[in-house]
């Protein structure tokens, strides 16, 4: 244990810092780091190097090379730089490389050197060029801030949603500031810059002079400044060799340190741990690394090579041509277990487990000591927590064995934390492997989340490892394996050296019907790569037509899209394709396409009936569909024509169409309608009143109501209205007029073809019982009982029913008898029924 703490360095009385090697770099750099533009992504991210030929003379023919490596030095990409001079490099939160050029254009590259997009930082930059730039991260995304040759600042807080903000001018700024950085306060990005002994804070509205509280006197300029990983703290390096540390709001001073070095440092970054009260800053010169904080002494390291610092959530990565190291504050759990002469519960439990392996009785002594103090649960938890913060698997195993050993003597210790730590460490050890090169710490891993880690493995095309992690952690398929397989398939379609058939087959064999995988998304990626035929083959595996059709339309495969939409049975989808086809094809080709798709043609006709009547007529004409064409002209005659002549002409066209369709009934009916219209116009001219657009029956009724009985009868003869129907019409009309005398004459004009019960019913409907009784006596025997009941003559109805010996009629009469007035009648019927039953 003493040996294990050999690389621990105390900073004051309450904190230790250690630096250990992550990787031995084997990237075979041809240039020194000082001769390159360098950018390293946080959270164990990749490293980008661009030899800067614009600051050092090189042969005119030589082009700079942009190289991207993993954190372990494994090459990921290398490409010749063919664009303009680059001022700064930086990584976005999505691990995209942002290259800021002098002309203000920012080029965005993927992890494997694939060009993604570009954007400009404004027109002003074209004239004044970019002097310096910073890439920073906020809760909204990754931002870019630039300093132009006019000594003005422009920034965008989110390159994914580019909104440029030109910051206010700094008064009296005639040259570039000695140092500057971005500060995020209250969810807004600011610029903090130093001009001589003065500090200025720029926001979108104003430029404010600020003064660090408690700053040592004699400062004439600030040489370097650094903001902490979480933007909560700020460090300033002055020309007097002092380092001021305080809050980023510049309202509170934390501490100050005199490093007795006035030379400006190459880099200065914060080194802090989440939930730690200690605050420290790491300062790097050419061959010296210094850790300073709220302590009278500093920690110093000698740098054998040119090195680069990468601030992290819980420490600082330091890499050079040969090594990649991690410098951080020793976590509390590790400190309590491993520091010399520690009597912490975790330290005693670790010793107990080691003695147990040696089969020594000291194991029992250590264990009893912990149990007597009631600290065994705390000891187990300390060992579990410390294991998470250890980089080397052997030490992780030792601590976890100790925790497992202690758990055996506890009845109710929840196993979740132990199991979860074992899983997390197995994942961390897998991704820390040299060939993977993602040296995440436990704190970084928890902050990043497993989903983001999987996304980063996918970005590196490490699909098998990502799938193994998903299966090991038993993540839901849609969030884990399915999502990764979908990414793999999207990458697979970009492999242009493999045939479309082979790629489609390989993707289908791997994915099958995996839930959560959208073949249409993969097909869209294939189409974006210029592989239309592959996209079509992939869409064959997509079970949802609603996902197939939009992409087929985008690929200008409209006829195939129509077939798929029809197969789906989704009428809305079919309409979508039809409207697209209508705009895409000429009229003839469009109609020809419809003729080959009966369902689509039927739906389009329905659409045209409501929206495009002329198109509907063209469809019927093209198909020689005279029956529907006739129906169309009939509807059109009433919908569009107001003049009687135009309406008759349209009906004549309809009749001709019906004759061509060999539908003589429809043709004759149409001709009858034309005759009726002409007659109605003549009646209006001669009699006045409203006749047009009345039906034949209503026309007859109107004539009767107007007293034009002869005209009504003539109309009935002309249009061959049956006698029964004419009698009904006349009966109803005369009753409505309450012309009872004329009604009686009409009833006696000849024998009624409808009988006389309707006369009784109509009179009773008009509440005229007197007239109804006149016709009740004329009703035939089979309807006599019903007629008598209608006029309320229950006794006579009973006599007729008894005379007829009709059981149904007697029951009907009984149902109309009331106890008070018709008791005798009811008894009479009952006696008749009884006599009938005896016989």
From Swiss-Prot:
GO cellular component, one term: lysosomal membrane
Principal subcellular localization: membrane
Residue numbers carrying 3'-nitrotyrosine: 4
UniProt record, GO biological process: endosomal transport; intracellular protein transport; vacuole fusion, non-autophagic
Membrane topology qualifier: Peripheral membrane protein
Source domain of life: Eukaryota
Coiled coil regions in record: none
Cell compartment(s), UniProt: Late endosome membrane; Lysosome membrane; Early endosome; Cytoplasmic vesicle, Clathrin-coated vesicle
UniProt keyword list: Cytoplasmic vesicle, Endosome, Lysosome, Membrane, Nitration, Protein transport, Transport
Signal peptide: none
Stretches the record annotates as Interaction with VPS33A: 642-736
GO molecular function, one term: actin binding
Family named by the database record: Belongs to the VPS16 family.
Quaternary state and interactors: Core component of at least two putative endosomal tethering complexes, the homotypic fusion and vacuole protein sorting (HOPS) complex and the class C core vacuole/endosome tethering (CORVET) complex. Their common core is composed of the class C Vps proteins VPS11, VPS16, VPS18 and VPS33A, which in HOPS further associates with VPS39 and VPS41 and in CORVET with VPS8 and TGFBRAP1. Interacts with RAB5C. Interacts with STX17, MON1B. Associates with adapter protein complex 3 (AP-3) and clathrin:AP-3 complexes.
PANTHER family in the cross-refs: VACUOLAR PROTEIN SORTING VPS16, VACUOLAR PROTEIN SORTING-ASSOCIATED PROTEIN 16 HOMOLOG
Function comment: Plays a role in vesicle-mediated protein trafficking to lysosomal compartments including the endocytic membrane transport and autophagic pathways. Believed to act as a core component of the putative HOPS and CORVET endosomal tethering complexes which are proposed to be involved in the Rab5-to-Rab7 endosome conversion probably implicating MON1A/B, and via binding SNAREs and SNARE complexes to mediate tethering and docking events during SNARE-mediated membrane fusion.
Protein name: Vacuolar protein sorting-associated protein 16 homolog
Protein source organism: Bos taurus
Gene name per UniProt: VPS16
């Amino acid at each position: 244990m003493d040996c294990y703490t050999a690389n621990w360095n105390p900073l004051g009385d309450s904190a230790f810092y250690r630096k250990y090697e992550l990787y031995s770099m084997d990237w075979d750099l041809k240039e020194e780091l000082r001769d390159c533009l360098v950018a390293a992504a946080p959270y164990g991210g990749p490293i980008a190097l661009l030899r800067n030929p614009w600051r050092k003379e090189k042969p005119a023919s030589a082009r700079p090379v942009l190289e991207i490596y993993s954190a372990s030095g494994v090459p990921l990409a290398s490409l010749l730089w063919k664009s303009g001079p680059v001022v700064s490099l930086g990584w976005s939160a999505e691990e995209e490389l942002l290259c800021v050029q002098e002309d203000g254009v920012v080029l965005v590259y993927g992890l494997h050197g694939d060009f993604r997009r570009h954007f400009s930082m404004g027109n002003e930059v074209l004239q004044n060029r970019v002097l310096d730039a910073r890439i920073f991260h906020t809760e909204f995304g990754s931002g870019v801030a630039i300093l132009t040759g006019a000594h003005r600042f422009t920034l965008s807080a989110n390159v994914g949603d580019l909104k440029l903000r030109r910051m206010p001018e700094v008064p009296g700024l005639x040259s570039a500031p000695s140092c500057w950085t971005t500060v995020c306060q209250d969810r807004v990005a600011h610029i903090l810059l130093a001009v001589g002994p003065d500090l200025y804070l720029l926001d979108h509205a104003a430029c404010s002079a600020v003064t660090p509280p408690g700053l040592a006197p004699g400062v004439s300029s600030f040489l370097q400044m650094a903001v902490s990983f979480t933007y909560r703290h700020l460090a300033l390096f002055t020309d007097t060799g002092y380092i001021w540390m305080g809050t980023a709001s510049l309202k509170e001073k934390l501490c100050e340190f005199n490093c007795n070095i006035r030379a400006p440092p190459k880099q200065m970054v914060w080194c802090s741990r989440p939930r730690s009260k200690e605050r420290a800053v790491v300062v790097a010169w050419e061959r010296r690394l210094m850790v300073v904080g709220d302590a009278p002494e500093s920690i110093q390291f000698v740098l054998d090579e040119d090195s680069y610092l990468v601030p992290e959530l819980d420490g600082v990565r330091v890499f050079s041509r040969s090594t990649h190291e991690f410098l951080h504050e020793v976590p509390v759990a590790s400190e309590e277990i491993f520091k010399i002469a520690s009597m912490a519960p975790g330290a005693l439990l670790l010793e107990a487990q080691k003695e147990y392996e040696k089969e020594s009785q000291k194991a029992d002594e250590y264990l009893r000591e912990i149990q007597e103090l009631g600290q065994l649960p705390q000891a187990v938890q300390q060992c579990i927590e410390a294991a998470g913060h250890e980089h080397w698997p052997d030490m992780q195993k030792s601590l976890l064995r100790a925790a497992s050993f202690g758990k055996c003597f506890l009845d109710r210790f929840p196993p979740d934390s132990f199991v979860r730590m074992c899983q997390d460490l197995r994942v961390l050890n897998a991704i820390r492997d040299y060939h993977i090169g993602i040296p995440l710490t436990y704190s970084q891993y928890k902050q990043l989340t497993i989903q983001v880690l999987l996304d980063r493995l996918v970005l590196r095309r490490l699909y098998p490892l990502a799938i193994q992690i998903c299966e090991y952690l038993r993540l839901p398929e849609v969030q884990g394996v399915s999502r990764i397989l979908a990414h793999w398939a999207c990458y697979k379609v970009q492999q242009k050296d493999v045939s479309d058939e082979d790629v489609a087959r390989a993707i289908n064999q791997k994915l099958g019907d995996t839930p959560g995988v959208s073949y249409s998304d993969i097909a869209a990626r294939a189409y974006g790569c210029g592989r239309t035929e592959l996209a079509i083959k992939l869409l064959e595996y997509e079970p949802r037509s609603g996902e197939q059709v939009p992409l087929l339309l985008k690929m200008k495969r409209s006829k195939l899209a129509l077939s798929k939409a029809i197969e789906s049975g989704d009428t809305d989808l079919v309409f979508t394709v039809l409207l697209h086809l209508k705009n895409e094809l000429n009229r003839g080709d469009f109609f020809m396409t419809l003729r080959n798709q009966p369902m689509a043609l039927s739906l389009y006709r329905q659409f045209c009936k409501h929206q495009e009547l002329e198109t509907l007529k063209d469809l019927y004409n093209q198909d020689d569909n005279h029956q529907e064409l006739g129906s169309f002209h009939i509807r059109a005659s009433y919908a569009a024509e107001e003049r009687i002549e135009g309406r008759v002409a349209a009906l004549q066209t309809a009749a001709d169409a019906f004759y061509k369709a060999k539908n003589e009934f429809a043709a004759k009916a149409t001709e009858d309608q034309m005759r009726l219209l002409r007659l109605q116009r003549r009646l209006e001219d001669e009699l006045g009143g409203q006749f047009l657009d009345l039906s034949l029956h209503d026309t007859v009724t109107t004539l009767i109501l107007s007293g034009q009985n002869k005209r009504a009868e003539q109309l009935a003869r002309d249009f061959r209205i049956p006698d029964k129907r004419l009698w009904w019409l006349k009966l109803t009309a005369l009753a409505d007029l309450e012309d009872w005398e004329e009604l009686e004459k009409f009833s006696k004009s000849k024998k009624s073809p409808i009988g006389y019960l309707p006369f009784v019913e109509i009179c009773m409907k008009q509440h005229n019982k007197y007239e109804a009784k006149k016709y009740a006596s004329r009703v035939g025997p089979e309807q006599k009982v019903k007629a008598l009941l209608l006029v309320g003559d229950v006794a006579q109805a009973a006599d007729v029913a008894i005379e007829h010996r009709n059981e149904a009629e007697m029951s009907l009469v009984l149902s109309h008898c009331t106890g008070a007035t018709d008791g005798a009648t009811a008894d009479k019927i009952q006696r008749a029924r009884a006599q009938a039953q005896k016989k």
